Each structure stands twice: as structure tokens, then as C-alpha cells.
Design a protein with these regions (language model features):
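Conserved beta-strand hairpin/beta-sheet module of binuclear metal-dependent hydrolase folds
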Residues: 6-64
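Active-site HxH/HxHxD metal-binding segment of metal-dependent hydrolases
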Residues: 26, 47-123
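Glycine-centered loop/turn motifs
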Residues: 5-6, 109
Length: 125
């Protein structure tokens, strides 16, 4: 397996960024981690790729803070619930989706922190 991609970014210290792809659904999943703290987030997890994603998170020693769904998915089944069960991470999704079992219902302007970094929620049409 290739070494993690590290990039200097706002917030200080290296940022781990991994782009993962599920060919069956055409879905990109993103793993971001604040390297100094070891905390990270997973964005748009795919149900069928849970084992791959969990293996990578464990291999890199990341403490997963949240599994974030950018929208309610018609193109694939989310893997966020499985990731929550495996790691205890929060499940984050737009409050307007009306989904149950979401621990972080998100609205425009919310922030999701991991280590010394944060993502800002931007509602889009």
C-alpha cells in the first residue's frame, strides 16, 4: 500500500487526504485526518466498501470522529451506520434529510472538528 498523502493546509500541521472510489456506484469517498492528533472524518462512505474503509482507518491509526454524508444517497447505500457501529463515530447528515439515527443533524454554517481542523457545512441547492 502506498504511503499516506500528506499536505500542509490551513489549521497547521500535515493533513492526510485519501480519495477512495467504488466502481459499482461511481461514488467517491474521502478520508481526511489531522495527522498530529490522529483524528479524522470519512465523507460519503459506501455500505459495500465498509471493510475496505475500516481497514484503512485502523491501519493508519485514525480516531474517526464522524462519518459524514453529503446528501441522502439515491446512488448508493450509506456505510455511515456500519462505521458508527465499528468505531463509535458520529453520523452526520443534513437535518433537512429527515433521517433517523443521525447523531449530528447538520445545517448551513455548522462546523465539524477533527483535531485542530474543521469543516464548515455549506448548504447547496
Amino acid at each position: 500500500m502506498a504511503a499516506p498523502l500528506l499536505a500542509a493546509a490551513a489549521g497547521g500541521g500535515p493533513l492526510l487526504f485519501r480519495q477512495l472510489f467504488d466502481a459499482n456506484t461511481g461514488t467517491f469517498t474521502y478520508l481526511l485526518a489531522d495527522v498530529p492528533s490522529g483524528q479524522g472524518v470519512l465523507i460519503d462512505a459506501v455500505f459495500e466498501q465498509h471493510a475496505r474503509d475500516l481497514s484503512l482507518i485502523r491501519e493508519l491509526g485514525i480516531e474517526l470522529v464522524a462519518s459524514i454524508d453529503t446528501h441522502a444517497h439515491a446512488d448508493h447505500v450509506t456505510g455511515s451506520w456500519l462505521m458508527h457501529e465499528a468505531t463509535g463515530c458520529a453520523i452526520a447528515l443534513a437535518a433537512t434529510a429527515g433521517a433517523t439515527n443521525v447523531s449530528r443533524p447538520l445545517v448551513h454554517g455548522d462546523h465539524i472538528g477533527f483535531g485542530r481542523r474543521q469543516l464548515e457545512v455549506r448548504a447547496t441547492p
